[in-house]
């Protein structure tokens, strides 16, 4: 996949800039102890950011799988086919990234404790709260990654880089202003990061729309996955809290909560007619999902 370095370049720049602003400029602004600043930034980048990148990486892998076919359709002058393909790619990305974002928001603390052991309560709370702040960026990054891949497939190689540059300016201004005028401290960086991803998402989406005159279907792409994810989030939280009362262990409680939540989401998505059998088949291991759904009488 030739396009990955191109996308990760601006994203890397985004973290480098955040790092410099928070660890170099901010301590001198507020006369703070640099050691604790570096420690806090380490928790942000090493745990919260790392965790939010997992679903984004998954979405990117699916995005890169779609690109050759979009490029072929455009080369064959089949704009209608390309639009359909793009629509399906965006929908697939949303169906996966919206529940991931909700799941990370609801189960931030137990998920961090599951992956990063031996943390003090204070570190755990900070990492979890930062992850909650970043959870929305999962959706934005997943969509902007997909759209920048599509733009490359359409031959607009520079557009995503220009958009990333614009977003970087927005992020930097936001980070500096928040650090100067609020007491949000490290949360300023998490908010600025989410703004960066949101800006990238909007600019890339516009560029794709301009390139192929394409309009995204809204209800099944965004609304139904969001509703199903809200149900799923409530279920995940209730199951986790219930198990935690009994087991007193975050790690033991979180795994069943994640598994049951995934099932709830899948069932809700199908019941609300958010996904068709054909779309389900285009998922990784889709034929298995269809088989299970038919066994459980969810699909006719």
Show where each model-derived region lies:
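Short, small-residue-biased leader/transition segments that mark boundaries at the very start
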Residues: 1-14
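Interfacial segments at transmembrane-helix termini and the short loops linking adjacent helices
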Residues: 105-138
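Interfacial transmembrane-helix starts/ends
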Residues: 45, 66, 78-95, 99-107, ...
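Helix-loop junctions and terminal segments of transmembrane helices
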Residues: 56-77, 148
């Amino acid at each position: 996949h030739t396009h990955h370095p191109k996308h990760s370049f601006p994203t890397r720049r985004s973290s480098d800039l955040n790092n410099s602003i928070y660890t170099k400029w901010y301590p001198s602004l507020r006369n703070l102890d640099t050691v604790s600043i570096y420690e806090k930034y380490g928790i942000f980048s090493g745990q919260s950011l790392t965790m939010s990148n997992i679903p984004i990486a998954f979405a990117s892998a699916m995005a890169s799988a779609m690109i050759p076919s979009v490029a072929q359709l455009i080369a064959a002058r089949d704009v209608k086919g390309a639009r359909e393909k793009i629509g399906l790619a965006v929908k697939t990305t949303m169906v996966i990234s919206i529940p991931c974002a909700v799941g990370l928001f609801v189960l931030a603390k137990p998920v961090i404790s599951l992956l990063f052991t031996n943390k003090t309560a204070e570190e755990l709370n900070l990492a979890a709260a930062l992850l909650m702040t970043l959870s929305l960026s999962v959706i934005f990054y997943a969509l902007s990654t997909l759209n920048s891949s599509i733009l490359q497939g359409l031959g607009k190689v520079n557009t995503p880089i220009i958009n990333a540059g614009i977003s970087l300016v927005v992020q930097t201004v936001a980070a500096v202003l928040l650090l100067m005028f609020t007491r949000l401290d490290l949360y300023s960086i998490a908010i600025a990061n989410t703004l960066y991803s949101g800006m990238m998402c909007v600019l890339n989406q516009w560029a794709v729309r301009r390139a192929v005159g394409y309009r995204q279907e809204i209800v099944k792409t965004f609304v139904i996955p969001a509703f199903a994810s809200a149900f799923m989030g409530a279920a995940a939280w209730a199951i986790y809290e219930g198990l935690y009362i009994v087991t007193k262990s975050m790690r033991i409680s979180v795994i069943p909560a994640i598994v049951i939540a995934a099932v709830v989401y899948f069932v809700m998505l199908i019941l609300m007619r958010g996904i068709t059998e054909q779309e389900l088949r285009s998922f990784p291991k889709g034929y298995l999902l269809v088989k299970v759904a038919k066994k459980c009488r969810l699909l006719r």
